[in-house]
Swiss-Prot record:
Coiled coil: none annotated. Keywords: DNA-binding, Metal-binding, mRNA processing, mRNA splicing, Nucleus, Phosphoprotein, Spliceosome, Zinc, Zinc-finger. It comes from Saccharomyces cerevisiae (strain ATCC 204508 / S288c) (Baker's yeast). Residues 47-57 have a biased composition (Polar residues). One of its GO terms (cellular component) is spliceosomal complex. SMART domains: RING, ZnF_C3H1. Pfam families: zf-C3HC4_2, zf-CCCH. It is found in: Nucleus. The modification Phosphoserine is found at residues 33, 105. Residues 1-67 are annotated as: Disordered. This is Pre-mRNA-splicing factor CWC24.
Amino acid sequence: MFRKRLVNKSSSDEKNQKKRQKINFSEEKLVASDEEKGSSDLMSLAKSGNSRTLQLSHENEGKLQKKGEDLDKYTLTVNDDSTKEDLLNFERKELAEKAKKRRPSDDNELVLNMSGKNKRLTKQINQPTNIRTTVLMDFQPDVCKDYKQTGYCGYGDSCKFLHSRDDFKTGWKLNQEWNADKEDSKAVTLDLEKIPFKCTLCKEDYKSPVVTNCGHYFCGSCFAKDMKKGTKCFICHKETHGSAKVASDLQKMLNKRKS
């Protein structure tokens, strides 16, 4: 504990005491400038009921303008490439934020180009990271055209192009032909169950087979001989009027069996 000493105060001590005043930190008050004090005084006058107009004098306006000019003198402006890029990025961010506020958030990504126009792109499909596929499209196979069409090339072995007469087909075309062959084979097998395996007139294999309107098959020569006797079918005795169609399906099946 400290005790106060009672000392006769002189005039010089009183002056020093005035200079060294205690500051109470519990009462936090902001120190106002002269201009703010003047404005606060004017506001207090207005609250008290005085009808004087609150206007800043020309001197105060001049002081404020001078201060603004002084601040402009000491502002630092750098026009480098780095600052330009930062400004561009800042403008882009502002445009993106404005666009997000205007439009509701969707699953689609929002992309902004340099002009600030909005472009919507579909969401990128997530692909597996452990698999990468590379596709090579050979639009110029370098095959000798003369040799492929005719089997002869004037350059002979010195020709720089490939001498090949193979026919290449795309995958979709091969699948289409495969499906067509399957359908044809199914149709043929269904019909063969009803078709006799030999001609009913000559009891031999079919030669240039024909089919009547009633669906019966005969050899072309056998059917012509039978039509001399009568125009009715030999099996079902229906009227054929002496006409018959070429059985192309049966002929294809017979050719496949021979081959």
